[in-house]
Amino acid sequence: RERVAALLGCKKGALGKLLCDAALHPIEPVVSDRKAPCQEVIHRVTDEDFDLFKLIPAPTNTPVDAGPYITMGMCYATHPDTGLSDVTIHRMCIQSKDELSIFLQPGSRHIGAMAERATQLNKPLPISISIGVDPAIEVGSCFEPPTTPLGYNELSIAGAIRKAPVELTPCISIKENAIANAEYVIEGEIQPGVKVIEDQNTHTGYAMPEFPGYNGAASHECWLIKVKAVTHRENPIMQTVIGPSEEHVNLAGIPTEASIFNMINKALPGKVTNVYAHPSGGGKYMAILQCKKTVHTDEGKQKQAALLAFSAFPELKHVILVDEDVDI
């Protein structure tokens, strides 16, 4: 957490507030016409030697994993009706030399809604996957509804954190943009209505390690991405993360803190001074709320704050309420 604070330029106890302020004062991304670092080397699916297993050094983390996983890919797509774009992080498994499976949690993520709508239109959904970007983009991409509703581009949160817009570049093989300073970019299309079994190559029954610390079950309802191209920097650096780790706790937990703080502050201004998504809950299951009571009638409002947090975040299981003199 101290390293994240140093990377984002604030104190570790103020990370949630920093992200909350960034979400309230977004700076939209821009499309640049300069030569993008992520396109220094280009591989097209039509190349004779094109093979994702060789081009992307994605790790297989455990003996029972469904395959090599991309876990730090910034998935960027645009809604086919509104033209509004979104970035999120999803687990993706390399299934063949030109195919990825992508797990989109039903009903909870924007790109899932975009893929559903594209399927209704019987059209593929163009998607870029940018790997190896700066920390502001990675943390900003982990925001979820209700703080960032459908149509809210989380790259604008990263822009606010960086105090400068995120630069995008047009993809070379699909009608979509990618993050210009990425190490790798995978360009492809989510196939309309096509679902695949995540462990179709291994048949282990598992996907990969999840954030609570156990191996997650393989999904039978993963969407299929047909890859069109891979671009990367000269001598690119691959970035990855697995679920049970302090790195994942920060990626998931700090945006959760910001979202809870933002929601409660709207309903009960000034009554909650800070929020901490404790590592014991993986950044999702447990939150500590630091409450401020100025008059005797404030007693009870801390319970209202807890109920607000529970109502907004279905994954939340425990909320601990403390006074403002407790160091969280």
What are these regions (language model features)?
Residues 1-224, 228-328:
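Extended, highly charged
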